[in-house]
Amino acid sequence: KAAQVLSPALQQYESAFRRAGEKYGVDPDLLMAIAIHETGNGTSSAFRNKKNAMGVSPNGGGPRSFETVEAGIDYMARQLARNYLGQGLTTIAAIGKKYAPPGASNDPRGLNSHWVKGVSEYYFQLKA
């Protein structure tokens, strides 16, 4: 199903999403849904220029750079396992309140208000 939802830019990393998900106990479809939403399905400059497939922006700074796309996926899976799922935030809505809170200082254009809906839509497409 992922091949029908992921753009070619992200399709080549499907196995990395699956490996990271298995390694940390995170649903790979959730990782892919977040990546699709955060990167405009592989079109964002953060993805193209910084190998950041997950929208990681520490402390309100700009997008974090990674050595490889796979390293960024692994990092985000570990963070989700430790700081979200491991703390009982197990739904997309619960994760979104912490991961992309509307009105956050690093969200000047109000895009976080679309995070839960966007990630949920991609997640259910991947699960269909």
Residue ranges of each PLM-predicted region?
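Catalytic cores of secreted/periplasmic lytic hydrolases that degrade extracellular macromolecules
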Residues: K1-A128
